[in-house]
Every structure is written in C-alpha cells, then in structure tokens.
Amino acid sequence: MTHEEIKGKRCAIIGGKRSGIAAAKLLSRAGAYVFLSEKSVPENQATLESDLRAHGIECEFGQHSEEVFDADFAIISPGVPSSAPVIKQLERAQVPVYSEIELASWFCKAKIIAITGTDGKTTVTTLTKKIFEADGNENGYHAYALGNIGQPFSDTVESLSENDVAVIEISSFQLEHCTSFRPNVTVITNITPDHLDRYDGNIQKYAAAKYRIYQNQTASDWLIYNDDNEILHQHFTDPERRASLPMKLVALSLEKNLGDEYEHCAYKENGRLVLKLTNEKEWLIEENQISTKQFRGQHNIYNALTAAAAASALGIDKKFIEKSILSFEGVEHRLEFVRAVNQVDYINDSKATTVNALWYALDTVTPKIVLIAGGRDKGNDYTKVFSFVKEKVRAVVAIGESQEKVVQAFGNLTKVMKAFSLDEAVRLASQEAEAGDTVLLSPACASFDMFSNFETRGKLFKEAVMNL
C-alpha cells in the first residue's frame, strides 16, 4: 500500500502495546483515520489516551467495539494471536489484516535484512547490525536493529534513507500477516518446536509461518538458512522447491564442507569459517577465536557465521566482519556470565525458552552444572537433553508452572529440587554447587507464568546472584 492509498483510510489497530502505538502514530502521520483498540486496561490508561489523542488517534480500552469492524484495514500487534475472536471477526467482515512489520515496510527506503528462526534471532540481529555499523561509520550510512528485538520498525522507518540498513528481527507471529514484505536478505537461523500451542501442536504450521519471510523475494535477493537444521535442510533441498525459488540461496553448515555442493554457501574448513557467495572462497577467522566468556559455544559459531554471510551478501568487506565478530560481547540474558561466588560461576540464560536453547547451553557450559529450569511449558520434549543432564548436571532446581514436568523428566537422571521463587532457586542452587561448578539459569520455558517477560526473569536472577 502506498502513502497515497493510506491517506484518508480508516485503520483499526488491534493491540495497544509498543508496536501497536508505533503503528498508530505512523498511520496518523500518513493521513489515515486511526482507531486503536486494546482489550486490556493498562494502569497508565489516562496518560496513554492523552498521548494518542494528541497524535490524532482515537482509542478504546477494555473491549473491541463495533468501530473496529468499520475499518478499511487493520494492523495486528504481534502479541495478538491470529486465532483471537477479534481477528476472526475482522476476517469474516473481509477487513484486510496486516502486521506492524508489513505496515512499516510500505514506508521503508532502506535495505532490509530480515532475521527469523526459533533460536539465535536476537544475537544474529545484534551482531549483523554491529557489522553494518562498523562499515557505515566509514562509508557514511546508518544501521538499525529493529522489530522483535525491542524497537518497533514503525518507530524508526521514516528516518531511514536509501543508504541505510534495517536489520529486523521477526517472529512467526509477525510474519503471519505479511503480504508484500520483501527483504533484500532473509535469514532463517533454525526451526525447532516452539510456540506449538499457537499452531495446534503442528510444527509444520509453525514452519510455514516462518517461510512467509521469503515469499516476495526476487532474483536479486538472498536467503540464508542453516543446512544443519533437519527441517530447513529437507525444505530447501527439495528439488522442485529449490528450482522454483528465484532468490540466491546460501546454505550454512558447521558439520559439512559445502564448498563443492552449493554455488553459495558458508561453512567451516580446517577449523576456519569460510564464505562462498561468489566464485571465490573468502576465509574468515578460526572458530576457536569465538571463545570469550560472554560469546562462546557452538551456537554462537553458527550465529557468527550467519551474520557474516548476511553482511557479505550486501558486499561488506571482510575486515569489518572479522573486527565486529572478534569484539562482540554477546547479548544480555543469553549465556550471560553474571559473577563468580565461592569459585562457582553464575550464568543467566533466561532467553533459553526452548529445549533446543537448553541443549546449546548444556553443550557450551563445562560440568558440573546446577541447572535452574521450568516456567510456562510450550509442549517440551526433554529427551533431547537427557544425555547432557546425566553426564554434566549435578542437580536441577525446578520452578514455575512446569515444575512437575521438569521433576518427572529429570528425576531419574540426577537430583531434582523444587523452588517456588527465583530467589529460593538461586539459594538452593548455591547450596548445592561445589567449587568449580556453574549455576545455570536456562529455563527451556516461557517466563509468563511468574514474570512479565524473559528480561525480567533474567534481571531478577542477576539480582538474586548479586545478593548472595
């Protein structure tokens, strides 16, 4: 949709959190008549209403009234599921529904790198932005990390020039209502079971939402995917599908030398990372150089290689890629070293909301480990980590709604204790740990049973550790 098409249109915004508010203000500036509808009643309702109305936006809280369904089109916030009654009613009323990412893309002049996947999105987004920032400082443009990483695309899009780069982290929820969104570079880090409660327990439905990220790409665009991930490997090696995709495909692997197999690839050879996006190999750093306390482990080698491939696809010089990777200190709440107490390391991996993320944490951290796990379960199957738990974990402290499931999963493998607060969990873990051990918060679950988000869970864990 163009600016001219938006002007004078009636738009309903479903959801009044940060993305919804950013979308509402963007549309109002573009000349649309905007009505924001939020089912919950926020504590700061009066302040929020005043701010919205100052921007020419009408709003309601505590309901979705009939006015919503009189719109010419609607924008859905990422926290509102497609199965919500209000969305179903909009569809029955034949009101087009778009995501906030889709909306912002209508206004975007900058090059777009879009990153999705189950795990690794935020780290890849942050590192990719850092690489482009290094290049931009020397070549006169700006790079931005936007989207699901915390800064709505709609907040920033109007300030982006055609020379700038928008690195956008995108969830499956945000992709469900994208129709014309077209990134110059698309990245899919991996697909493992997650959010299956939103997809009828069907991982193929979840994967299909992720694949929407590349649906509008053309021959001039790039798609980077993890070929070591079984679901992605099967999807992109299907001969008929591969032949039908117009964009340049970049297969990425740490398990296989892909140099002779694919025209475009990124892989490891003789311990070094290699990019092959042209006819020539480009040798990067050795994998063992990615080994600081804050940025280490196999998963971060994948993340580094992925960010390198994304930057290389848009022509970034190797010196900026290597410099950025070597100086990268990781991202908060992702295997974040907090402190050592009595020769015990404490690591905050609150962002580990899947079993796959827990697997990488247990693979990375040296034994023995006292693990704090649990929260809101997302259909977890813990069998994948049984061998690690048996070999490396001294004890597990189970927390949250899934406490009993965690006890049942690991009770025959190691000692398991229950805690009913994060403070108690840290205290029990500290009592159980011995010199040389690591206390690891890696919940493998969502945080919403006990906390507002994983960031709050991580911050409270760090506070508890600092109080020991």
Swiss-Prot record:
Its EC number is 6.3.2.9. GO terms for cellular component: cytoplasm. One of its GO terms (biological process) is regulation of cell shape. It is found in: Cytoplasm. InterPro entries: Mur-like_cat_sf, Mur_ligase_C, Mur_ligase_C_dom_sf, Mur_ligase_cen, MurD. It catalyses: UDP-N-acetyl-alpha-D-muramoyl-L-alanine + D-glutamate + ATP = UDP-N-acetyl-alpha-D-muramoyl-L-alanyl-D-glutamate + ADP + phosphate + H(+). Keywords: ATP-binding, Cell cycle, Cell division, Cell shape, Cell wall biogenesis/degradation, Cytoplasm, Ligase, Nucleotide-binding, Peptidoglycan synthesis. Pathway: Cell wall biogenesis; peptidoglycan biosynthesis. GO terms for molecular function: ATP binding; UDP-N-acetylmuramoylalanine-D-glutamate ligase activity. Gene3D superfamilies: Mur ligase, C-terminal domain, Mur-like, catalytic domain, NAD(P)-binding Rossmann-like Domain. ATP binds at G117, T118, D119, G120, K121, T122, T123. Transmembrane segments: none annotated. Cell wall formation. Catalyzes the addition of glutamate to the nucleotide precursor UDP-N-acetylmuramoyl-L-alanine (UMA). Belongs to the MurCDEF family. This is UDP-N-acetylmuramoylalanine--D-glutamate ligase. It comes from Chloroherpeton thalassium (strain ATCC 35110 / GB-78).
